[in-house]
């Protein structure tokens, strides 16, 4: 009887749905395990095989943990607000809601066809008013705590999309061919900087990949430095700069300010004013990426003004350059070209002085020297000397001297900036704020504030969202007077900042989440998703979670205990899958040809989960043959009914193999080493096939080990051998420690530490026996001939080493 995967998979998917097999209760008597995928944006292109990798890994973990006795929460939902649906609406007139619902049906169908054990009763959708009611509620709480405010700020404006982009989104959009410019706009901003220290400190508690934690540390960018005042010659003002290297003050030879600095035009002399104005105008058209790229040519303009170096008394020219950002530090820097590569390049380009103040092994006129480890030189005046001091001592001495002279003060700075939260588009959560004619703002109290129906989805001519074109929704009045609703909507990140909490209590209309359920289920034990979200979703979600912690809504400081980033699956051409390359492998096509179990096993067998690897159709053919081999263990080649299994004891060699497989598969599954777990199951299947053994215990053990990976075929075979309950309810087997020990071991023989041969010996053999066998080994015997043995070293079960010298 051949294995027909399409019939089997359809049968068991229908049965799981009918039986609510994976519906999760809030059973506080059982240990819990919360495993979560980064929920998808349901795009019109559907899922390809690369998307399935993380979902498969989380499902294997969920099924394995259930078999280990855990109450497992494994939910799925949709991050469904977003720009693509709105762009499609602009082109076609199709309401984004219609497009989104159709895309969700397609996505859900694919996920169900993969046999993923999600509790679909907890399904959420960020565009559902019952859901975004609570997204809006969180925004109001942020506003009440002073963490949401309005400001006219320079934003990243995408002309083609007619909307603002967060700093973190700019790189991707430019790479996609969009034009991004800077322009001032009234925006809602979230004060994420108020949580910078906590976001930084709590990273140490997390079981996350170190590279992701480091990316967040770099993005937050905490630095300790000094703000220094430079007297401006001829202006009776001071220019304050921020530096992390006050120890190099004696080497500062020029200052640079941002084009947006309030003194930029004021410092321009009459001769320089036109050039300065032109430079500032051009700089404002550039994105931060264009301005700060390390590879770009440095540009600048001299203001004509000078400032006095407080350490040397020398006048320093004040320049304007677009690589200095007004949003970081004070928007002004001191430049020490001998010891900073960017300053060195700028100095070389504009023929500015370069003075060595950190002892360098080479000529700093020819090459910059940036190491901190060396000592200070050429750094003394009548009041202070740094000469001979290492960095830390020089930093402290200079900082103290500047504070004593009231010429500076210690300061902590962050690269992290407040989160520009509003978007000029329709398909997003309305911001629940009313603007009254007297200038006051009041909160919408009747939540959810839902989106109105519109005929046109184009942004308004003023740069506002399409909501500005709908008078009946836009204007209103109440006991406080006439008002105009906020027309900006929230970014797509809003709904994903807290969705993991709603899965815990999705039907609750009175609270965001029931406190008792939250205490039971949180934190998320395992969160699986791509590393591309390191400084976007993951940072924003941590910020909102900390606010909710301060509000008493959640009981933990962090949402995600363990994070795992799966590697990308490339196309067969070893390139990232994309429509433009024509190398996308749609998930539905592969499922139709090979079935879900083969796809699940193949994707996990490709290599370590965290590594990038290419798809290979020949490989999945091999997995299909493996599944057929498993099938034949129960059905045989030509039998229409399952083979009668034996209750007789299995051979000892097979018994040992089985217990080794239990141990290996369990340990590897626990550690997400799925490829090696599958390899071990293949070894076990080969041993079963070779032995011809039809022992019930052996077959049942194999099926339970394999069931998290290939749930459909194992359910079918489990039923075929006489079980009337789901294999997902079968406990994971335990191994006998005595049976996993090797009975015959390979012992290495060394002479003077060099491997000269090996031999086989029973485990726990006495030292005397090991020495005898080692000396009799043919390849070793010839090396001992004519040698005097000075010492014999025996490590039981591992090696024998002879220390010798020539006679």
Swiss-Prot record:
Q: Which InterPro entries match?
A: aa-tRNA-synth_Ia (IPR002300), Leu-tRNA-ligase (IPR002302), Leu_tRNA-synth_edit (IPR025709), M/V/L/I-tRNA-synth_anticd-bd (IPR013155), Methionyl/Leucyl_tRNA_Synth (IPR015413), Rossmann-like_a/b/a_fold (IPR014729), tRNAsynth_Ia_anticodon-bd (IPR009080), Val/Leu/Ile-tRNA-synth_edit (IPR009008)
A GO term from the CC aspect: cytosol
State where ATP binds. Answer: 579
Sorted alphabetically, the keyword list is: Aminoacyl-tRNA synthetase, ATP-binding, Cytoplasm, Ligase, Nucleotide-binding, Protein biosynthesis
Q: Where is this motif: 'HIGH' region?
A: 40-51
Database matches in SUPFAM superfamilies: Anticodon-binding domain of a subclass of class I aminoacyl-tRNA synthetases (SSF47323), Nucleotidylyl transferase (SSF52374), ValRS/IleRS/LeuRS editing domain (SSF50677)
Highest taxon of the lineage: Bacteria
Where does this protein reside within or beyond the cell? Cytoplasm
Might you give the EC number(s) for this enzyme? Answer: 6.1.1.4
Q: Which reaction does it catalyse?
A: tRNA(Leu) + L-leucine + ATP = L-leucyl-tRNA(Leu) + AMP + diphosphate
A GO MF annotation of the entry reads: aminoacyl-tRNA deacylase activity
GO biological process: what's one of them?
leucyl-tRNA aminoacylation
Motif ('KMSKS' region) positions are 576-580
Principal localization?
A: cytoplasm
The entry sums up its family as follows:
Belongs to the class-I aminoacyl-tRNA synthetase family.
Q: What is this protein called?
A: Leucine--tRNA ligase
The organism is Pelodictyon phaeoclathratiforme (strain DSM 5477 / BU-1)
Source species taxonomy: Bacteria, Pseudomonadati, Chlorobiota, Chlorobiia, Chlorobiales
């Amino acid at each position: 009887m051949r294995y027909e995967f399409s019939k089997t998979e359809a049968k068991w998917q229908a049965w799981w749905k009918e039986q609510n097999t994976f519906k999760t209760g809030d059973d506080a008597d059982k240990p819990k395990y919360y495993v979560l995928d980064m929920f998808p944006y349901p795009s019109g292109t559907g899922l390809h095989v690369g998307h399935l990798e993380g979902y498969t890994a989380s499902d294997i973990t969920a099924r394995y943990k259930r078999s280990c006795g855990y109450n497992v929460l494994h939910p799925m939902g949709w991050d469904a607000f977003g720009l693509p649906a709105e762009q499609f609406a602009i082109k076609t007139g199709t309401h984004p809601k219609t497009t989104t619902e159709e895309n969700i049906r397609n996505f859900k169908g694919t996920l169900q066809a993969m046999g993923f054990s999600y509790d679909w009763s907890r399904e959420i959708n960020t565009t559902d008013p019952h859901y975004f009611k609570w997204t809006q509620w969180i925004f109001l709480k942020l506003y009440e705590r002073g963490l949401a405010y309005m400001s006219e700020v320079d934003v990243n404006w995408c002309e083609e999309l007619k909307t603002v982009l967060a700093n973190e989104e700019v790189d991707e959009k430019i790479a996609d061919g969009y034009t991004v410019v800077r322009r001032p706009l009234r925006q809602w901003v979230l004060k994420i900087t108020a949580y910078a220290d906590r976001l930084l400190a709590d990273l140490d508690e997390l079981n996350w990949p170190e590279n992701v934690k480091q990316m967040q540390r770099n993005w937050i960018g905490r630095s300790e430095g000094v703000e220094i005042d430079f007297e401006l010659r001829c202006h009776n003002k001071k220019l304050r700069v921020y530096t992390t290297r006050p120890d190099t003050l004696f080497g500062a030879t020029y200052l640079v300010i941002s084009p947006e600095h309030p003194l930029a035009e004021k410092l321009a002399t009459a001769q320089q004013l036109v050039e300065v104005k032109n430079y500032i105008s051009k700089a404002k058209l550039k994105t931060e990426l264009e301005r700060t790229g390390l590879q770009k040519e440095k540009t600048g303009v001299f203001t004509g003004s000078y400032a006095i170096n407080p350490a040397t008394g020398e006048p320093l020219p004040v320049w304007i350059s677009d690589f200095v950002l007004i949003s970081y530090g004070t928007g002004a820097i001191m430049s020490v070209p001998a010891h900073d590569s960017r300053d060195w390049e700028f100095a070389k380009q504009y023929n500015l002085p370069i003075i060595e103040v950190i002892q360098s092994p080479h000529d700093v006129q020819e090459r910059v020297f940036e190491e901190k480890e060396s000592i200070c030189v050429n750094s003394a005046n009548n009041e202070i000397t740094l000469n001979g001091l290492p960095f830390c001592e020089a930093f402290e001495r200079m900082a103290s001297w500047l504070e004593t002279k009231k010429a500076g003060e210690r300061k902590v700075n962050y690269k992290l900036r407040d989160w520009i939260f509003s978007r000029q588009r329709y398909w997003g959560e309305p911001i629940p704020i009313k603007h009254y004619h007297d200038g006051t703002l009041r909160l919408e109290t009747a939540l959810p504030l839902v989106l109105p129906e519109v005929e046109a989805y184009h942004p308004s001519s003023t740069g506002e969202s399409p909501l500005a074109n709908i008078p009946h929704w836009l204007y209103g009045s109440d006991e406080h007077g006439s008002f105009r609703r906020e027309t900006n909507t929230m970014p797509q990140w809003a709904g994903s900042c807290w969705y993991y909490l709603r899965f815990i209590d999705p039907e609750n209309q009175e609270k965001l989440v029931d406190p008792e359920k939250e205490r039971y289920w949180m934190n998320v034990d395992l969160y699986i998703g791509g590393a591309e979200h390191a400084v976007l979703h993951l940072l924003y979600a941590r910020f909102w979670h900390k606010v909710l912690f301060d509000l008493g809504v959640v009981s933990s400081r962090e949402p995600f205990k363990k994070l795992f980033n799966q590697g990308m699956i490339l196309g067969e051409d070893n390139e990232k899958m994309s429509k433009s390359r024509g190398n996308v492998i749609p998930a539905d096509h592969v499922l139709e040809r090979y079935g879900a179990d083969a796809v699940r096993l193949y994707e996990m067998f490709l290599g370590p989960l965290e590594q990038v690897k290419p798809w290979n159709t020949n490989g999945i053919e091999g997995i299909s043959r493996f599944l057929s081999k498993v099938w034949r263990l129960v059905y045989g080649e030509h039998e229409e009914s399952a083979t009668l299994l034996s209750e007789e004891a299995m051979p000892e060699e097979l018994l040992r193999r089985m217990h080794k497989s239990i141990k290996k598969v369990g340990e590897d599954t626990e550690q997400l080493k799925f490829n090696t777990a599958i390899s071990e199951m293949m070894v076990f299947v080969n041993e079963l096939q070779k032995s011809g053994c039809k022992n019930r215990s052996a077959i049942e053990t194999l099926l339970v080990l394999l069931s998290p990976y290939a749930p459909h075929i194992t359910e079918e075979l489990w039923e075929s051998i006489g079980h009337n309950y789901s294999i997902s309810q079968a406990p994971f087997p335990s191994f006998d420690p005595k049976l996993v020990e090797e009975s015959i071991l390979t012992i290495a023989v060394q002479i003077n530490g060099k491997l000269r041969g090996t031999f086989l010996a029973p485990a726990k053999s006495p030292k005397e026996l090991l020495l005898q066998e080692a000396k009799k080994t043919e390849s070793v015997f010839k090396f001992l001939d004519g040698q005097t043995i000075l010492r014999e070293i025996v490590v039981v079960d591992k090696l024998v080493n002879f220390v010798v010298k020539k006679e």
